[in-house]
Structure formats: C-alpha cells, structure tokens
C-alpha cells in the first residue's frame, strides 16, 4: 500500500503531526488507532512534514523491498522535518533503523500504541483543547468513508518458512466477537457500506479464545470464524473476507455467501500448487483436494470470485514444480492473483533451504505467471459481459464513476468504469449492465434510472 499522509483542519494551539502509513491493511488499522488517540488528545494532522511539529512513520518490515521503502520514508521525514518517531513492523528490528538513521527520536514495534503515544508526548506535549470536536465513535478512518478495514485479530500461529510475521507480531490473539461487532456496527451507522475483514489468519479467528462467547446486543456470539461472519452479515453492509487460510471449515462459509450475507469473494493465499514446494513452505499441500474444494465452492456459489497470492522462485523450485503452479492457475481459474518473487527475509527459516533460484529465473517465471494469470482473468471477466452487477462507486467522474463489483476489493483488484445518465455518489451501490471486459477491468452502463 502506498504511504498515506494525513490531514485535518488546523487548530490554533494544537501541536501538528504528520503521519506516514506504509504496508498492508493491518498496518493501516494500526495507524487508524494511533491517529484516533492523537486526535482525542488534541493533536492536529497535517499533510506536510515541513509544517509539522513531529513526524510519525508506521513502517513495514515484511520484505527487504518494504524495509527499503520504510528507510526511505524515514529519511525523507528527517530531511524535511528532523523530528521523527518510528513504529510498525520494522520497529521490531530497531538496530537496522538506527544504523541508517541514528537521529530518530524513538522506535517502537507493531501494535505498541502506548509506546508511540509516550514518544509523541515526550517530543511534543499535547495541548488539549476542550472545544475541539469530539472524535467520532468509530474513530479516525484513513480509508474513504464508504469502506473500512475491520481487524479481528493480531498475530499468527502458523509457521510458514518464508514468513516472519509471528516473530514481528506474535502468535494469534483474537478480539472477542462482541468487541468486533460493536466496532462494525458503529462503522455501518457512520456510513460505511463495505467491511473488509482482515487479520493475519482470518479463518483461525477465535482458536486462541477457545471460541468463547461474548455479549452483543441481546445475544451471545461465539468467537468463531463462521459465527462472526454470519453476525457481520446481519448489519446490512457488504462483508468481504481477506487472508483466509485454507482450513477445512472454510467450506461452511459458502452457505453464508449463497444466502447473500457475505460477499461471494474469498481471498485465500494458496502461495503455490506443487505439493513439494508447499511442504518446504510448511503450507497445506494437497493440490487435488484444493481443486475439488474449489469446484464444490463454485457449485454452491456460482458467482464466487477467488483471489490468491503466490510465490515464484522459492528455494528449490524446479521447472516442473513451476509448471504445476501454472497448470493450477488454469484449472482452478483463479480470478485475481498477486505474485511475488521470493526474497530472503532475515529471520525466515526458508533462508536455510538448499538450491536458491537465480534472480533471472525468478524474473522469467514471474513474467510467465503474470501472462498466464492475465489470460485466466480475461477469460473469467469476459463471462460477465451482458450481466448486471452491483457496483459500489469509489470515484465520481463527469460521465459517471469508477467502482467495483462484489468480486473486487479496493486497491488490489479490478474496477468498473460506469457510465450514468445522472450524477453518481461515492459509496452508492449501482446496478450496472456490463458491456465490455479487459484483462482486469470492466465497463458498463448504470441501469434503473
């Protein structure tokens, strides 16, 4: 995700903070929590580093390329302002930051909200103004008003060999279901039309709580993936499930999708298709069972959109194993796919595996993957031509707007160019007749008015 520099209306005596958020949606939610606390204490947010009293940079440390981006952002903040507090995933390895930028004021790790606030207080004491507008009940959101990320847990208890998330964020810690639902309800009442459910491992939600129930309204709701998804589906907003590890119980969510409670969309990171590669990754490794499950899912939910992510060039990946992956893309007909060339990450067990793949081979396989996936995506989208789709409008244009179908998440998936005879509104859900399809995007005309 691109860096996000926040802004709010100035207040005469309030200290001004510039805030940069890097990385994934989970990090963006962390940023929202910090910003909400800062606003509640009277701090103002500004777009420019130069006009701020302090800069906070929420970093990403998952890949070396992300670390480089984080270090660059810190350097820019130091050059333009000079007073910088660093937090986020890269903050778990402070020596790397200090080596490049020894003058940062403080470094904290992910989810260390109190430590961030303490560092801000020390550098720029708050000047609380009792006449400031109250912070909204749903908190300060960094997304457009019509959609919001809903984080249901922190950390991950899996031990994939390519990943260091458990070392950065710890094991799975789920939020009580009642807490999640109250936040979701506040968001919907504030105008949010789409809830994007996120975590490091969404389908493991509640395992650490032993699926304990907690109160919500006049009933008790279990901290269980299926129960939570069903309750969220009763709030009247689109509910989109992200980062769903392919456990067997995920099959049951198809009933909620078929009933219209949850969007027919599943973001499920398969990572590869070759059983031998998956074994080295310490991921579920039965391609035959996975294909059979996908067929069953699509039989139950014909309009299901599958998004996934894959890694090419994993240590030891042979040409035959890579060909298995390409064949899986074709046979499974994955609608949307992200692809990453394997990068050694300090602290990852995969670094010790034999037979690293040369960078040139990684690049060549990445290109072949993307060409194959583009064909699959184009074929899947072409089937939508002539159909009517519900489209949520993200941007208004002179001749209509740009939006997304139920099969498209913001920022990572495709869009729909919508032509309309009347002005559209951001957040509106329009019925659109699809008239053309490309490799990733659609276009059509709004109908019904």
From Swiss-Prot:
Where does the UniProt annotation locate this protein?
Cytoplasm
* SMART domains registered for this protein in UniProt: Elp3
Residues bound to [4Fe-4S] cluster 1: 24, 60, 89
The protein's enzyme class = transferase
Report the main location listed first in the record: cytoplasm
Q: Where is the Radical SAM core domain?
A: 142-379
Alphabetized UniProt keyword annotations: 4Fe-4S, Cytoplasm, Iron, Iron-sulfur, Metal-binding, S-adenosyl-L-methionine, Transferase
Per UniProt, residues of the MTTase N-terminal domain are 15-125
One GO BP annotation is:
tRNA modification
Quote the Pfam families the UniProt record gives.
Answer: Radical_SAM, TRAM_2, UPF0004
- Residue ranges of every copy of the TRAM domain listed in the record: 382-448
**UniProt record similarity statement:** Belongs to the methylthiotransferase family. RimO subfamily.
What this protein is reported to do is described as: Catalyzes the methylthiolation of an aspartic acid residue of ribosomal protein uS12.
Q: Give the HAMAP family listed for this entry.
A: MTTase_RimO (MF_01865)
What's the protein here called?
Answer: Ribosomal protein uS12 methylthiotransferase RimO
């Amino acid at each position: 995700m691109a860096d996000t520099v926040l802004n709010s209306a100035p207040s005469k005596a309030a200290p001004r903070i510039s805030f940069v958020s890097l990385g994934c949606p989970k990090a963006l939610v962390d940023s929202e929590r910090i910003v909400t606390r800062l606003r509640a204490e009277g701090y103002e947010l500004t777009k420019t580093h130069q006009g701020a009293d302090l800069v906070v940079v929420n970093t990403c440390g998952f890949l070396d390329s992300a670390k480089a981006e984080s270090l660059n952002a810190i350097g820019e903040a130091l050059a333009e302002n000079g007073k910088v507090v660093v937090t986020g995933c890269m903050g778990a390895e402070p020596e790397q930051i200090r080596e490049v930028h020894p003058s940062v004021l403080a470094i904290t790790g992910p989810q260390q909200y109190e430590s961030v606030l303490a560092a801000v207080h020390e550098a720029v004491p708050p000047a609380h103004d009792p006449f400031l507008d109250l912070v909204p009940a749903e908190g300060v959101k960094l997304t457009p008003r019509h959609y919001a990320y809903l984080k249901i847990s922190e950390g991950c208890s899996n031990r994939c060999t390519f990943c260091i998330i458990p070392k950065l964020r710890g094991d799975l810690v789920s939020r009580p279901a009642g807490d999640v639902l109250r936040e979701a309800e506040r968001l919907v009442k504030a105008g949010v039309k789409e809830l994007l459910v996120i975590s490091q491992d969404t389908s493991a939600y509640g395992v650490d709580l032993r699926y304990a129930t907690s109160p919500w309204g006049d009933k008790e709701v279990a901290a269980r993936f299926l129960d939570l998804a069903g309750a969220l589906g009763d709030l009247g907003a689109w509910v989109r499930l992200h980062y769903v590890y392919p456990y067997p119980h995920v099959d049951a969510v198809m009933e909620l999708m078929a009933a219209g409670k949850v969007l027919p969309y599943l973001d499920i990171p398969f990572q590869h298709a070759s059983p031998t590669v998956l074994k080295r990754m310490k991921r579920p490794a039965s391609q035959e069972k996975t294909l059979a499950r996908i067929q069953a899912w699509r039989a139950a939910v014909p309009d299901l959109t599958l998004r996934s992510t894959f890694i090419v060039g994993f240590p030891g990946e042979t040409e035959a194993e890579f060909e298995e992956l390409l064949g899986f893309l074709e046979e499974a007909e994955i609608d949307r796919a992200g692809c990453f060339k394997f990068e050694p990450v300090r602290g990852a067990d995969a670094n010790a595996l034999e037979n690293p793949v040369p960078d040139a081979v990684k690049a060549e396989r990445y290109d072949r993957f993307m060409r194959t996936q583009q064909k699959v995506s184009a074929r899947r989208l072409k089937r939508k031509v002539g159909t009517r789709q519900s489209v949520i409008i993200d941007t208004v244009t002179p001749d209509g707007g740009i939006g997304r179908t139920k099969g498209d998440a913001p920022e990572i998936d495709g869009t729909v160019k919508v032509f309309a005879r009347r002005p559209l509104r951001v957040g509106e859900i329009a019925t659109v007749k699809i008239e053309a399809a490309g490799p990733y995007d659609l276009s059509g005309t709004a109908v019904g008015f």
